[in-house]
């Protein structure tokens, strides 16, 4: 696998270890304070990013830039999820302390991430398409310029939407034969399979295997079953909404919110009001728990006109993020 980034600005590089979590979190907090990202990371989040998953190997997947005083000043991480079948994706994440920017650190870090991403993609599947991906909040022009100069292309624009809950919330309504039920663990596998089917026509989506699903969706620490719902037609899953509470984001965004991570409707049940009923149920559950808003994200180019559904229910844009990529 790829060697560490080249020496730059006096930093020495080594993999991130579990013993680095506290110092690494301090670095991430300094970056967040400067950049005001949509997502905030707790120390536990960093532990999971580094170690939670059988496919993860921090000695291979991560790097930490240490200054002469032993203080972390930059980091990088590359992840290829198991189970990609259409396009193998390498997700790159990293950052540079605000006081260490403008010294070429980010450029070298990105070059290392691309090299490692290419190697991990080739190891996962020697033939077939792959893509190295970097997400960035809209308006971070320095990062966008860095990506442009490295040959990455802007591939997608994602909107983050918010909906206040102190105004009228519609009642869930479904045609005869469909049932809206709260999510429960016994539905996990059926919902996973429904999700893989529902998202098969979405750009950049790949099937979720059981481990990834249980660790990062319905088994995650932020997942809230009481805010999550499933629509059944007999015993078949027609649609689902899975919502989480990312409380570490609330102070920065200025309100409490439930974030709908996944909303999907299988093709035979589209245009039947299933998505509307699921979101209505979610909003009502959030309001009953005293939550101020319902939030979610959407691809501007969603093939099923999801944005029309959301705006019709009162969701409005709050911020944007961009997906940059390079096909390999």
Question: Which ranges hold each PLM region?
Answer:
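Short amphipathic alpha-helix that is part of the acyltransferase structural core
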Residues: 1-50, 172-208
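Acyl-donor-binding surface of acyltransferase catalytic domains
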Residues: 1-5, 80-176, 322-326
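A conserved beta-strand-loop-helix scaffold within acyl/acetyltransferase catalytic domains
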Residues: 32-56, 76-85, 203-263
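Glycine-rich acetyl-CoA-binding "A-motif" of GNAT/NAT acetyltransferases
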Residues: 59, 69-74, 155, 236-239
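A short, internal acetyl-CoA/4′-phosphopantetheine-binding micro-motif in the GNAT/acyltransferase core
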Residues: 66, 79-81, 91-105, 260-270, ...
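Conserved acetyl-CoA-binding loop-helix of GNAT-fold acetyltransferases
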Residues: 102-119, 262-265, 271-288, 293, ...
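Conserved active-site tyrosine of GNAT-family acetyltransferases
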Residues: 143-147, 310, 315
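C-terminal "cap" of GNAT-fold acetyltransferases
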Residues: 159-179, 292-307, 313-328
């Amino acid at each position: 696998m790829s060697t560490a980034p080249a020496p730059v600005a006096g930093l020495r590089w080594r993999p991130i270890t579990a013993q680095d979590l506290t110092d690494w979190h301090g670095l991430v907090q300094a970056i967040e304070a400067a950049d005001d990202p949509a997502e905030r990371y707790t120390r536990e989040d960093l532990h999971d990013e580094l170690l939670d998953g059988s496919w993860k190997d921090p000695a291979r997947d991560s790097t930490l830039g240490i200054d002469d005083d032993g203080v972390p000043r930059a980091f990088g991480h590359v992840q290829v999820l198991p189970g990609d079948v259409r396009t193998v994706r390498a997700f790159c994440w990293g950052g540079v302390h605000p006081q260490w920017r403008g010294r070429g650190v980010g450029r070298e870090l990105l070059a290392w991430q691309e090299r490692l991403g290419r190697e991990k993609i080739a190891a996962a599947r020697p033939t077939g398409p792959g893509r190295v991906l970097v997400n960035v909040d809209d308006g971070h022009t320095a990062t966008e310029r860095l990506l442009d100069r490295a040959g990455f292309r802007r591939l997608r624009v994602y909107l983050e939407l918010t909906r206040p809950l102190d105004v009228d919330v519609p009642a869930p309504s479904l045609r005869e034969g469909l049932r809206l039920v709260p999510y429960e663990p016994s539905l996990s596998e059926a919902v996973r399979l429904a999700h893989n089917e529902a998202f098969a026509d979405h750009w950049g989506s790949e099937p979720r295997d059981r481990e990834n699903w249980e660790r990062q969706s319905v088994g995650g620490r932020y997942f809230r079953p009481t805010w999550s719902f499933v629509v059944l037609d007999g015993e078949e899953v027609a649609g689902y909404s899975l919502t989480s509470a990312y409380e570490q984001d609330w102070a920065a965004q200025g309100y409490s919110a439930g974030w709908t991570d996944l909303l999907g409707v299988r093709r035979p049940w589209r245009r039947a009001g299933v998505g509307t009923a699921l979101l209505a149920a979610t909003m009502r559950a959030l309001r009953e728990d005293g939550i101020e808003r319902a939030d979610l994200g959407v691809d501007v180019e969603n093939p099923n006109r999801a944005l029309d559904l959301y705006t019709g229910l009162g969701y409005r844009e709050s911020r944007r993020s961009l997906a940059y990529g390079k096909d390999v």
